[in-house]
Amino acid sequence: MVTIKQIAQEVGISSSTVSIVLGGKAAERKISTATQEKIFAAAARLGYQPNMAARSLRGGSGANELVVAMFWAQDFRASMMLRFWDGLRAEIEKTARPVRLVIYPYVNDHLKESEALTSGADCHAAIICNASYADLQFLEDTQLPIPVVLYNRVCNGYCSVNVDDLKMGALAARAFADQGCRTAAVLTSSPVFEGMENRMHGFRLEGEHHGLTILANRYCENGIRGGYEAVSHRLRHEWKQQLPDAVFCGSSAIAHGALRAFCEAGYIGEKLPRLIAVGNGPEESDAFSIPSLSVVYLPMEDMARECIQLVLGQLDGQIVTPESRLLPIEYVPRESCGPLKEYAAQ
């Protein structure tokens, strides 16, 4: 096992300085960025892994217990956390070593203010979810003292677990086209990360390829109320004379609000536009809504399992270079929109 003393000898710096930097205390001790980079580079080159059993955490965990922090944004995505949490717990139950999960809520664009992440004194590793553009820039510019895995984000120097966001949008557009739709509207919130933009871009590209006219998009709040109010407003204005054949929703929550608004206005059964959502909410809510909601399913539980595997792999020294994993997605047809043609005969 590579020691702090060996790293100090490699770079010609005192062991105490190396210990301060690897312990996340460099800023408060005013150690230069150049020195920090030299130490981190040597640690990576030599394959240094922190001695987790010896590290003393303020939380008072046992010598063999690993503390993994889950950073989750304090916004509309808070309601989506349970599915991810369930996936983490299911995977942790398979491991022999005890792992304690700790939730750290944070405000988008302010991840850099999370001392638990930058100090390394409260946890052995972290899974960062919902990072914004500014948060990703912070991560790219920073050498963190603990292993980090990103959920559904890509950043140089970090392990990550992702899905093909372009394909998510494309599958929805193809399903609409296969159901004979000619016009489609989009209900989504303002994009807070590149994946949201990619989903809509994929939807437009695939829609245009199949002759689907995509109506001008206007953003709404990401939630049930946001979907309800967006559809109610459009029914009084631009959709008053002519409904679109289809509506693609950026989240399950937006879709449930949209369905309520259509129902109140008398658009039920065959009168209802085809509707597909990015399936990021509870699966039961989508399956048992009236009508049941067709989704391009986001496999959050599976992504969580992969995240914790990458965390443990880094802590055990099995993963020493950043690794990204891309998980498959699928379209789940229900009552709000029928199947893709290739599956229609099955």
Predicted features, each with a name:
Residues 73-83, 102-111, 161-171, 187-233, ...:
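Hinge/beta->alpha junction and helix N-cap segments in small-molecule ligand-binding domains
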Residues 1-58:
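N-terminal helix-turn-helix DNA-binding module of bacterial transcription factors
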Residues 62-174, 178, 235-239, 253, ...:
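Alpha-helical recognition/docking segments in bacterial nutrient-uptake
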Residues 15-20, 58-76, 183-190:
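Short beta-strand segments enriched in small/hydrophobic residues
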Residues 124, 182-183, 213, 245:
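Short acidic/polar active-site loop segments enriched in Thr and Asp
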Residues 43, 92, 207, 235, ...:
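Conserved hydrophobic residues forming the short capping helix/wall of the S-adenosyl-L-methionine
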Residues 236-346:
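Flexible loop/turn connectors
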